[in-house]
Amino acid sequence: MKKMMMTAMMILVAALCCFAGTHTHTITLVSRVEKQDAQYVIRNAETGATGASVVYCTDEIARQDVGTSFDIIQCNDSNGINKVHFTVSATELQAKVGGKLYGTNGVQILMNGVACGSEVSFTRTTVGAVAAGTVVEGFEVIWPTNASLVDATYEACVVLTATSL
């Protein structure tokens, strides 16, 4: 009897771990940061959009996911010293059940595992040409899941802005 109860508890714990995981996937948010007359142009690798800032909305994320990982990848063609100031904002969060949308709150941007609120800024310096594919910074956007929306899929909207210094 005791052995059966322990086995049942182990199965229950394993099942809970499957649904409470912190699975994330990586999306290349920026493939190039190009300098043009003291301005930086960002190109979104997923959509091809360019500009001084780029908005990226994730695809639907499965209900057991609690966040999405992003990489900022910088590539400059010049041979000088380049300083780029990045600002990341998580501006919208929503959960979808069937055709209905529900707002969620508590969004956090994590840099190196530290929660920084819904907006974070940082500056990076590059000297000379930076090889394509060099990761300048990685970050996660996380938010709490709502127990009453157990069948929801979640979407996050992230804005990345780069300015020259």
Regions found by a protein language model. Give the residues of each.
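Positively charged n-region of N-terminal signal peptides that target proteins for export
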Residues: 1-4
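Short amphipathic alpha-helical "recognition" segments used for binding
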Residues: 6-7, 68
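Bacterial N-terminal signal peptides
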Residues: 8-15
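N-terminal small/polar-rich segments of proteins
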Residues: 20-101, 124-165
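A surface/secretory-pathway sequence property marking extracellular, secreted
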Residues: 96-117
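Short, solvent-exposed S/T- and G/P-enriched segments that are highly enriched in secreted/extracellular
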Residues: 115-126
